[in-house]
Amino acid sequence: MTRSRTASLLAVAAVLPALLTGCAANARPATRSPNPDTDTAASAAPKTPGAGGAAAGEAAAEAARPVRSPAGPVRVPAGVTAGYAVVDVTTGKTVARHLAHHRFRSASVVKILIAVDYLERHKGAVPARDRALLTPMLRGSDDDAATALWRRGGQGEIVRRMARRIGLTETAPPPAAKPGFWGYTAVSAADMALVYRYLLRRAEPRVRDFVLGNLHSASKCASDGFDQYFGIPRAVPRPWAIKQGWSGYGAVPPVKCTRATVASLRIGAVTMGGNPVDFGRPVLHTTGVIGDRLIMVVLTLQPSGASFRKSAERVTKLARDLYLSVA
């Protein structure tokens, strides 16, 4: 990590007292790697959350909550279900949100929880063999590394421990029928913003520095060949520390990422406490800390059959509009 990037993270840590007043991909079980295109046992027709019902109720509830109006219009593209939350690091206040409590399947975003849980259960220096799993999982969104750590940590117990510790109310383990699929963890934009706030103000320095340091060094090309520089990396100026997530675009990208210039399943919608999680439509998420000012979480369900390129363009525009509206 460069000195400037380290300085940025230290700057974030410097404003933590102010927060006290306010303020990934898919899982691949070790036994086999699920194929999103051939696993017919899990190919139920997806239900579209956000078209009404729970999403409509959330929209009405959020409309009643006082949040500063963005400076400019932030429009969710047609056919996309989006939940987002932007938190001002200095004041700790949520400055923009939309369907922030709507549940999405996490894809690789859950890898943050996997890493934090590991680091908090294992005190002291990280052994080289475990660092060889944690670092590529955080920087390159490596699925095999995540699966190894997921199984070692007790699978869904990782999510339950983190939910209790951080106070996450919409986050839940994968469905009982799919315990190995960490990418089926349910998350919300509000909960993921809480995760970043936990890292910034409550986590031990060694945990904060390890996780945010690696997210600050996220590679352009993910381990599976997808280009993970969409959303925040393309929409806002550096420095940033990011964790992206994608699912539903196949195991191999149509155009492999190059530094010079994932697997998913479809099992329809599962109702979790009246807040349905859609496991069918593609998801594309961008999350992270922007400089020493903002936490941004944008979770999206894309139209069925959407290409990765078009989805990335939509998420990038949404992240850019959102950033400009609060910058």
Where are these regions (language model features)?
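N-terminal export and membrane-targeting signals
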Residues: 1-14
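Penicillin-recognizing serine hydrolase domain
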Residues: 2-5, 24-39, 53, 57-82, ...
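C-terminal motif of bacterial Sec signal peptides marking the signal peptidase cleavage site
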Residues: 19-22
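A mature extracytoplasmic/lumenal domain signature
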Residues: 88-90, 108-110, 122, 141, ...
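Active-site SXXK
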Residues: 92, 103-126, 137, 296
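Flexible glycine/proline-enriched surface loops and loop-helix/loop-strand junctions
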Residues: 96-100, 140-145, 174-180
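Short, well-structured active-site flanking segments
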Residues: 120-136, 141, 153-155, 207, ...
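Glycine/small-residue-rich loop that forms an oxyanion/phosphate-binding "nest" at active or ligand-binding sites
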Residues: 147, 151
